[in-house]
């Protein structure tokens, strides 16, 4: 049986969830389609999802059409969850991108299409809601060519009499994009030679599989119009990305979720081989797991199974596997399946409104962050505050909704701040000697620090031989240095530097590793004071698509948001701007873009890295440490 993993993507309210229900119903997987309005759909399981008509977390369902099984990965539609969209896309064999016949190409549609092109995923366009009044399909096609891709092939005609209907498009004009993209076919066309239909279809299929040609189909998901034709196309056009002739197992985890009873489940895409119940599977050089229970999606439901075949999705109860964990032979994993997630750029504190719910909150955050690589948290050991780091403000709104709905916890979140870093300005050394006041520790430590190029991270080297200072003391120095790097002169993490352990001395038998561990961060701080530090802040690459009249406004606003526009291009009455901007400014820049373009502007961003901060220095309160703070202050007075 052929297995296809299909993604359905759309802008908010284009009908994505309704289309999923219609596909399940038309294929016979379910007896009655669910309704977004009534909250009875199978994929949007959260109240927030149903209330907004958007998808926040990936859901999996399936149907069968003749000898083809289709797993539907109902991917998130909100752009604050682009990282989860990419993670979902990584398991897909193909995608259906919805376009609302009434609303046309929205900013969100373009961002999703950009993601599909980035991942080179074969994509079908489905123009939904064609039964609404005032629809101008030629205008929609024109907009698709201008804002998405000129390489579209309209596969159907839409008729109005005696009632609205869709039929195959047999006009020769539909093949223009196919002919113009192939030199051999174009030469035949220019010389007036006849075409074989098989030639055109073969070239269409080749380019479709390469993700460079996009067939267009039509319908109404709400009224099941054109859905059967869409199912037939899905079953015939998409191929599984599973390598042929491979019997060895290879699978990858793409989703983690917890049940209401706090049971942990991992979703795995099988790329090759077959997974059997009671198999013992290698997940690392030293670690193996035994498969004791497994489920697969079948006809709209999840069923227990003894096997999961190549190409399928399998759900395993497991406490060991992590996101992107690989089961079996990782050499068989398709290259584009390796997805890097951006680092969280914002941080804040979160607290419960009722103190007795604190432990519940901590457990909930552990589960949520387990399945979301863009969310991290820790508890300050002194203030006991819960610190969250994350990517976007809407992400926080959704987390609060999950906490309230799933865990019944009411939380308060402070205004977030950007996560800065510190980098030494120059090379410096500092040594604190044993028995020299105010050093209370039975240890001498000398450190040197020097800046490295931005993006290098922290490098540590010991230049003290193990014959002179044993391993336990050496390890303690490194641990103390790494602890000291957590807070620089302004309270931010220290990065992009090389730290060398230059000198160490101990007294036997009174010296202990703790003496070196506690002294090292104090020595590091003094070295940083001599070197000085600069603040680094996260920067983003941005790419803006907007009506041409927005150009002057963009240049006018750029200095206000510290944005640097590096290139400008005008295409089809649209301006394309590329540049860089501090992450702290992007939300306001986006808000202005939306306001001044009446929602037509699109802003694509990705993390560029850290650069020297512009403007005033932002300090973060230092986390107290009762064991070393008194000594720190003594050395501070000496400086």
Curated annotation (Swiss-Prot):
Keyword vocabulary terms for this entry: Antibiotic resistance, GTP-binding, Nucleotide-binding, Protein biosynthesis
Binding residues annotated for GTP, in chain numbering: 10-17, 74-78, 128-131
Keyword Protein biosynthesis in record: yes
Domain of life: Bacteria
Stored PROSITE patterns: G_TR_1, G_TR_2
Domain tr-type G as annotated: residue spans: 1-244
InterPro entries the UniProt entry points to: EF-G-like_DII, EFG_II, EFG_III/V, EFG_V-like, G_TR_CS, P-loop_NTPase, Ribosomal_Su5_D2-typ_SF, Ribsml_uS5_D2-typ_fold_subgr
One GO biological process term: response to antibiotic
Family: Belongs to the TRAFAC class translation factor GTPase superfamily. Classic translation factor GTPase family. TetM/TetO subfamily.
Its biological purpose: Abolishes the inhibitory effect of tetracyclin on protein synthesis by a non-covalent modification of the ribosomes.
Designated name of the protein: Tetracycline resistance protein TetO
Source organism of the structure: Streptococcus pneumoniae
